[in-house]
Amino acid sequence: MAMARLGSWLGEAQWLALVSLFVAALATVGLYLAQWALARARPQPQRRAVEPGEGPRPGSDALLSWILTLGSWRSQWQAAWVTALNEEAERKGGPPFLSFEEDPRQQALELVVQEVSSVLRSAEEKVVVCHVVGQAIQFLVSETPALGAGCRLYDMRLSPFHLQLEFHMKEKREDLQISWSFISVPEMAVNIQPKALGEDQVAETSAMSDVLKDILKHLAGSASPSVVLITKPTTVKEAQNLQCAASTAQESCPPKPPRAHELKLLVRNIHVLLLSEPGASGHINAVCVVQLNDPVQRFSSTLTKNTPDLMWEEEFTFELNAKSKELHLQISEAGRSSEGLLATATVPLDLFKKQPSGPQSFTLTSGSACGSSVLGSVTAEFSYMEPGELKSWPIPPPVPAAKIEKDRTVMPCGTVVTTVTAVKTKPRVDVGRASPLSSDSPVKTPIKVKVIEKDISVQAIACRSAPVSKTLSSSDTELLVLNGSDPVAEVAIRQLSESSKLKLKSPRKKSTIIISGISKTSLSQDHDAALMQGYTASVDSTHQEDAPSHPERAAASAPPEEAESAQASLAPKPQEDELDSWDLEKEPQAAAWSSQVLLDPDGDELSESSMSVLEPGTAKKHKGGILRKGAKLFFRRRHQQKDPGMSQSHNDLVFLEQPEGSRRKGITLTRILNKKLLSRHRNKNTMNGAPVEPCT
């Protein structure tokens, strides 16, 4: 019994549990259905068209401002607006019939983003609307009153202008469509100025201006231009793959011609010929403006007076790219902005064929789109420069240079020793460069001469004999120095030694200085003037003069490894009747330096004090051919008689105040002594069989 009751209670409890679970399931399903029904019955929220109260969006403003600064946008949107205006004007019809063109003088515009709003059209498309403001925009408007009538050209300027831009972005699309519409605001000013205004158009200008303003505002407001920009993202790996593929293709293919952006266009020698004087009468200053459409580059020439024949020789270089299609040449009046345009010409560019090339002529018109009158012609020279092509400038041939050093030293006895050293530098010929003109070329290049004159220095020199010594200066100039044999020669040698110590920048080889003769000259004023002319002539001359060979040349020849031999020297030639002047020997033609040694124009008369320099013992110690290479010595008395109009030293003035008798007396005594010393020295050298050496 008990077991039966227990089984019935368990069955009832199980049944109650199953019923409870079923009721709970029904309640859950009912609650879900009720919520679904309520959700369906609830009204959906409306889509927001504009969000004015959200405040500024710096992120969106920066992004849109960056998009509006892209070169692809700047190069397309003005042309797209002009196309839309022409389509709207053609759809509207006329008269008047209007057509729009881009103004070549228009600079790149900066659009300022002011308000940004977002509108969600669908799940795959999003539209961003923004309000932008520009400073000013210009168009060229050609107006035809009736079909077949003459065209009139106007400048239309909107400042400032307001646009509403819409950016249409779609999912899974790689392009961005930008469309905009013109917003007419009260503060916008519309300026319309006719071009080439004649006297018969003055009365019609004000009447047509108001009519055109209304028409242009209506056309600008109804036109709907648009531009499509490609926005394809590229990863770093894709960019590297593209570069590798391009390099592989270039290795397998022959070298390609230079790209458009690597070319440069050179425009020069612009010649303008105007048929008549356009515009108002009067004197004007014409200027030529050359402008490239893309990338925008603008160059202006110098001012030219108002003449029918205008010429500009300036050179203008333009950077090119694949979008460089037109080059505008504008002749305008300086000082006037828009109404100063006199004539314009458009030059089409074909970068693939590199045309135009060379001198080309184009017609100058008023710039309107429909058949305007021809105002003249313009001729210019065009050339394309490839990368790596340098502008070829004429390189002048190397010019030999001659440096002349004049050094004066005053000895204690009053004798002035003047050393004139002439050094000619041959031009250096580098490997791979054009060689200079040779010596036997019919075209001779003048020698550049640099004269260096040092101040007078006073030196006390003892007259004692010493052996010959050899010195080597820092400039690799070999000097054979004779100490004490002759005070005058010693002074000259010391001057040459000091001048040779100047270190050269790039010494090539060893040079040798030869002093082949020493002579005293007593010159009058007439001979002074003659030597001055000879000094000038020797600087300008590039030819060598023939002269008899000197007997002492063999004893003082240069080393065989030297390519440049010694120059000639001075040799005294006393005359019986007139010993006041001593003739100077000319240089032999064998001198390899091909330059003349200059004479000292400041020769003096010898006075009686010259005996302190000349001693018989000194004259006996001369050795033939002591010194080496290219210097001539001229020495004189310190007291000289110059032209009173020339610069005089204190001693010169003292000498001029001396009486004539004392000077003649000193000259006579000097003649006698020099004559005796010269004959004695020559006789001794002849007996010993030595070559004759000039006596000092």
Swiss-Prot record:
GO terms for cellular component: cytosol; membrane; nucleus. Keywords: Membrane, Phosphoprotein, Transmembrane, Transmembrane helix. It is found in: Membrane. The modification Phosphoserine is found at S60, S435, S441, S581. Residues 542-553 have a biased composition (Basic and acidic residues). Residues 539-580 are annotated as: Disordered. Pfam families: C2, SMP_C2CD2L. Residues 554-572 have a biased composition (Low complexity). The modification Phosphothreonine is found at T445. Residues 51-242 form the SMP-LBD domain. Residues 245-362 form the C2 domain. The chain crosses the membrane at residues 13-33. InterPro entries: C2_dom, C2_domain_sf, C2CD2/C2CD2L, SMP_C2CD2L. Its main location: membrane. It comes from the Eukaryota. It is a single-pass membrane protein. This is C2 domain-containing protein 2. It comes from Homo sapiens (Human).
